From Swiss-Prot:
GO CC terms, sorted: cytoplasm
Coarse class of the protein's main subcellular location: cytoplasm
Gene: ytfE
NCBIfam families (UniProt xref): FeS_repair_RIC (TIGR03652), PRK10992.1 (NF008221)
Full protein name: Iron-sulfur cluster repair protein YtfE
Lineage, broadest ranks: Bacteria, Pseudomonadati, Pseudomonadota, Gammaproteobacteria, Enterobacterales
Entry similarity comment: Belongs to the RIC family. YtfE subfamily.
Amino acid sequence: MAYRDQPLGELALSIPRASALFRQYDMDYCCGGKQTLARAAARHDVDIDIIEAQLAQLAEQPIEKDWRAVPLADIIDHIVVRYHDRHREQLPELILQATKVERVHADKPNVPRGLTKYLTALHEELSSHMMKEEQILFPMIKQGMGRQATGPISVMEIEHDEAGELVDVIKHVTQNVTPPPEACTTWKAMYNGINEMIDDLMEHISLENNVLFPRALAGE
């Protein structure tokens, strides 16, 4: 099957582990989920035939859960427990680790300078964002008022883009979250945690941008 003309967001939802493949190629399937596979491949200089073949192989596996068919209230409950609560645990710990690494390894050329600042900014951004979703937008959607939520949803999508921009900066200062040879145990553990946080955040944003919000606006 040809996947090149399909949006990344749709492919991430319909093919098991496609999201992990896109992350491997640094393709944005959450905030940039509306771009086609062909466009994303061209932007990242990826051979379209190779990635199509990889997707075809992944598509042979059964999908764990098709969120496009799950009731919106259940999706919201899942987002809060699986992603919101997790981000609230992840980011404070990563900030502590970054503070230590930047202090202890200040004289190393590969130290991720500014990482603490950018993780703190992301933590503040997401804390405010998630609170607004939980207190305003999610109750509206659960009450069947999705059609009236155009304004709040637009704001949330803009904030998703802003979070994505901060993630790009974090990836830049960490050499795409790759520890240098001299990295200590804390440094390596922090980068593992950052990679996990980015994976979670991309899945989180994708589920909202590509499933929850469109279905809510359609009046479900």
